[in-house]
Amino acid sequence: MIFEDIKEFGEEMRLFHSQVNYRLYYSLGCHLVEKEGKKGAEFKVWAPNAKDVQLVGNFNNWDGSKHRMFFNGYHGVWSIFVPDIKEGEVYKYKITSKKNEVFLKADPFAFYSELRPGTASIVKDVTKPYNWEDDKWINKRGEWNPFENPINIYEVHLGSWRRKPESEIKKIDKPDLEKTQQELKDESGFLDYKEICDKLLPYVLEMGYTHIEIMPLSEHPLDGSWGYQSVGYYSMTSRYGDPEGFKYLVNEFHKAGIGVILDWVPGHFCKDAHGLLKFDGTPLYEYPDEWRSENKGWGTANFNLASPEVRSFLISNAVFLFDIYHIDGIRADAVSNIIYLEYGQPEVRGLKNKYGGDEDIEAIEFLKLLNEIVFSKFKNPLMIAEEATAWPLVTKPAYVGGLGFNYKWNMGWMNDMLKYMEMDPIYRQYHHNLVTFSLMYCFSENYILSLSHDEVVHGKKSILDKMFGNYEDKFASLRMFLGYMFGHPGKKLNFMGTEIGQFMEWRFYEELEWKMLKYPKHDSIKRYVKDLNALYKKERSLWEQDITFEGFKWIDHSNYQESIISFVRKSKDEKDFLLFVCNFTPVPHFNYLVGSEYLVDYEEIFNSDRDIYSGTNILNSGIIQPKLQDRNGIPYSIELNIPPLSTIILKPKFKDEKKETETIKKKITITNLNTSK
């Protein structure tokens, strides 16, 4: 063991050990530097309990004796400067534990990694200046109120949205471990970040989404984990190219006015041998107690969120993604698994904290700190929790007892509504509460209504195929359901494929069923979603008061016998509202009365049953005049045709009082002139 005192390194490491170094990516890992006139790379790795650490790679024929690292015992950090190292060199740390076990570990702070099944880190400088052209977007985001603006998210898995045609995929007849990195890329079928961007961005703009949410891009060994079992938190996966490619993608999306959100997994990590597990022979990143470190549900290891160093590692990673890659938001995965000791682990029972509860106190404090730091460093980021329980105040600040996120997925709404839509309409009248219950709590948090990737895998069927009924009914139900979803309070998220009516479940290893668009029903559902997205963006009443009861009012929630609901969505202007009527059965209704708070004309501006959407074209044409007839305790009403399995949207046509006054004045003037003659 070679000792070295790195004095200039001391303050950074003191902050690291105190959980307040949130820019660790500048301190640890590999950085291209110049020392004493020599250009090369400096490597630093935290392995406080190791007996010896050596740097190995192609540059020394993987012979670590040539590059034994120096140990700073006070901070537990090993370091070495190697001249003439350039970008593209592969490396690992050869770590000998105090039990004389030898591990070859990837760099936890590596900015780039080999494509699987390769596991080495690659020297890459992602902190060097990049020609960003998104100042306009970043400045706009700084002034943007996320609660009073449209958020309509398209969730994407980059490896399966589009893939290379079979004709362009090279098949190489030798074992994977014998293939070069280029050969692995050539036969993977993946598009690179630039190719994906150049196809995905025009599509997102065409369809009218406001944001994309990308499933995890941190480096991971197994395609089938979808990125949720990571080993390289600072390394954008090499499946789709290099870090500059991802910067290009973000830059282009921002220039076009589209936000970029990343899925992020702060609770657990992959247990592959080259990763974080027992990094220096001891549980460094995971909990020391097996009952806490083992995540038996996913076969992963839980991060030790009580550790100051692990907190610094993870919070620095979140900051890194905003700082280096200019992302706009993070969706924290599996927050319920983080905040509860026993969540999702039925074989584990009786785990209690020091107060006798099942809350993970240290993990909760970590989440509060994470959000506090991100919000203090970046203007108006989206910090979204995937949290599936009734834990209170998830989207409230830590200073009032909250976790500090600004949005969470509304898992209750999703579960209730998918259960309802899978049900035979004959029986829906007995389960009407599944439609109405969400309005009892939907303003208790800031919600995103999510129909995510999790709902279209593992035998659950696609969103379209979940819909009850025959072929025609499934499409009608999907249109109705999405229309209802866009009327319900909360921002929106849909997983790729829903917008084209994909019948098959999502498969991570092949692209979406784009071929289905040659069939009219699928093409028309795409048009429907595009038009619905455009309406959502245009109408302030659908997003300006999303988190308050001021933006919603029931017209009729009690017609369970016919499974019809009606409600109003309002903007801050009391005369700017939309009236929604949703029919959850295949029975049409004619001359159906719907209550109106105002004695005002209406116009139908959207109807999921239009023939251009492959519907039956039961419409409400022209001006719909009100009646002086009470309905559901509301003084006025309008008479409508309600198509089967439909959502219709109506807008009031208030008279322009200023224009009316001017018209009256003109008439008076003309009358006076005629009289004087």
Where would I find each of the regions flagged by the language model?
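The feature marks proteins involved in alpha-glucan
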Residues: 1-42, 72-155, 160-184, 195, ...
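Conserved, mostly hydrophobic/aromatic
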Residues: 45, 93, 156, 204, ...
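Short proline/glycine-enriched turn/loop motifs at strand-loop junctions of beta-rich domains
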Residues: 46-53, 597-600
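Short, surface-exposed loop motifs enriched in S/T, G, D/E and P with embedded aromatic residues
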Residues: 65-73
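C-terminal beta-strand-rich structural cap/linker in extracellular carbohydrate-active enzymes
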Residues: 87-91, 621-662
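Substrate-binding/active-site clefts of carbohydrate-active enzymes
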Residues: 114, 129, 137-148, 157-359
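Conserved alpha/beta catalytic core and glycan-binding cleft of carbohydrate-active enzymes
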Residues: 326-328, 346-509, 516, 537-609, ...
